[in-house]
Amino acid sequence: MTDVEHYESLLAEGPFDTESLTVLVVAGATQQDVATALGIDLAADPTEYPEADDEEFSAYAITDVEGGVLAVEHSGYADPSLDALRALSAGGRSVAVVRDNIQAHVRFGCARDGEVVFDDDEYLFLDDPSPVPAELRPLFDLAWVDPEDEDAEDDADAVAVGLAMAEVVTGLRLTAEDLQRVADSGYRLAPSLVYLPDAD
């Protein structure tokens, strides 16, 4: 099973509706580090995911995984800002985010040592793939739709490809147990619409 197939299986059999989803993976961080970067009050009691539509807030579930932290939210509109990625990767850490939403905008972003390495709001349709790090390019190419190729097809699951790239960046391989544990951990409110794709 390839890395992408591993994540396709996790998504297909896991506890989440993947139509709208943000997955944040941080190596070397604590839950408090992640909560602070996302604007979450970790002292608040966890609850079920809020059902009401709220443009200002979503909610994250956070859990420890071997070597770091996994955080998940279900709106696809509360993915972390670039500043949050920088903060989470400071001090030798690494972080990656994969986001899909009802607009079918699939984001992949990553940072190391306090610097954003790559980020794109719709990475499948990137006009110029040259900014993609060489270590990610073989996986990226599985999902990328080349605008110059009239016969291009996006058969690969872009979220699964994103998670495979997140593993390359962070060194953390997510498991079915990780996904179930984060789903069972409960949710805490987090602000929405904090990501600005073109922010420096």
What is each stretch, according to the model?
Residues 3-134, 139-147:
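Hydrophobic alpha-helical segments that drive targeting, anchoring, or assembly
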Residues 4, 10, 112-200:
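Long, compositionally biased intrinsically disordered terminal regions
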